[in-house]
Amino acid sequence: MILIIRIFCTSLVISSFYTIQKAILTRDLDFKHIGIISIIAIVISSFVGILMAIYGYGVWSLVSINVINAIISLIIYYYYSQWRPSFSFSFSVLKEHFYFGYKLLLANLLDALFSNSSYVIIGKIYNSYTLGLFTRADGLRKMVVLGISTPLKSVLLPILSTIQGNEVKLKTIYIFVLQIALLLVTPLLLFLIVYADQIFNLLYGSKWDAAIPFFKILCLSSILYPLSTYVVSFLNVKGRSDLVLKIESIKKIALVIAFVITWITKDIYTLLWSLVIVSIIDFMINVIALNIVLKITYRFQIKKTVTALFINLCAISVLYIFLNIVFVDYTKSLLALAIGFVMLPILNFLFLYSINPKLIFQAKHIILNRDSNL
C-alpha cells in the first residue's frame, strides 16, 4: 500500500510542472487547447489502464491512469505553451506572492479540512445507514452544483483580471454575475427539489427513497453557494486574500457551532437545517465583503438577490400548481418530469422578461459580442 501511494503521488509532482502553462492558457481564455489536452491525456491514459487491467495488473492499472495522464498533459502543455521557466530567483517577487498566497492556502486548507466533516459527524453520531443516505444525497447535490459553478468560475477569473483596475466595470459585472448565477443555479435546484422523488427512483431505485428529504434540504442549502465562489474571484482580483481567509474562518466557526448543536440534539435534521442557516450567514458575510472592496451597498446587493430569487420562485410555483392540477400524483410520473424540464426554463424566461428585461439584453450582448462590456 505504501508503494502504491508513493507512485500515485508522483502524479501530483508531475502536475506541478505544467501549472503555469495551464494558468496562462486559462488567463488567455484558451479553453479549446485546455480541453484538447485533457481529452488526449484521458484517452491515452485510460487506454493504457484498461490494457493493464486486462493483463492482470489489478490496482496498478488505476495508478497508471493518473501517472500517465499527468505525463501526457505535461508533454502537451509544454508543446502548446511558449512559456519556459528561467533559472533566476527573486526574493522580492517571492515575498509579494507569498504575502498574497499564504492566506489563500490557509483558506483552502480550512475548506479541505471541513469539506467532509459532515460525514465524520454523521458517522460518529448515527449508524452507517444514515451516513449512506446522507452521502448519496450530498453526492448528487454536489455533482449538480459544482458542475455548473466550477466552469463559470474558471471563465470569470481571467475576465476579471483584465479589468481589475476598473472599479465601475467590476461592480457592473458583479451584479450581472450575481443575477445570472442565481437564475441558472436556483431554477435547477428548485427543479431537483420538486422532482426529487422521480429523479431518485429513476437513478437509484426505490431503495434510496429515505435519502430524498436529505437531498431536498441540501439543495436548499446550495442555492446561494455559487455566489460565494464568485465573490472569492472578485476578492482575489482585488488582492484581498485576507478577506477570503476571514470569510472562510467565520464560515467554519458557524459550521462548528452547527456540529456541536447536532451532537447535543442527536437529530440529523438539525444538521441539515443548520447547513441552510450557515449558507445564509455565508451570503451575508460576502455581501459585507463586497461592500468593503467594491463599495456596493448592502441594500442594492440584497435587492438584486431577492429579485432573482423571486423570479425563480414565481416560475417554480406556477409549475407546481400546474402539475398538481394536471396529475393526480406528479411525483410518480416521468411525463411530469419531462414537462417540468421543458416548462421551467420557459416560465423563468417569461418572468425575467416581465420583471428585469435589461438583464436579458445584457446577456445577449455578451454572448453575441463575446466581451465583458455591459
Regions found by a protein language model. Give the residues of each.
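Alpha-helical transmembrane segments of polytopic membrane transporters and translocases
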Residues: S11, I71, K103, S118-V120, ...
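Alpha-helical transmembrane segments of multi-pass membrane transport and lipid-handling proteins
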Residues: F47-L51, Y55, K171-P226, V256-I261, ...
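Interhelical loop/hinge segments that connect adjacent transmembrane helices in multipass membrane
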Residues: K32, I75-N116, V120, K124-I125, ...
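Interfacial/gating helices of multi-pass transporter permease domains
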Residues: I2-L3, E96-F100, L104, I121-K142, ...
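Helix-loop junctions and terminal segments of transmembrane helices
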Residues: T26-R27, A137, R141-V185, V232-V237
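Hydrophobic transmembrane helix module of multi-pass membrane transport proteins
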Residues: M1-N116, I321
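Membrane-proximal transmembrane or re-entrant/amphipathic helices at the cytosolic face
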Residues: I296-Y298, V306, S317-L374
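Helix-terminus/linker motif at the lipid-water interface of multi-pass membrane proteins
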Residues: A53, A112-M143, G147, P158-T162, ...
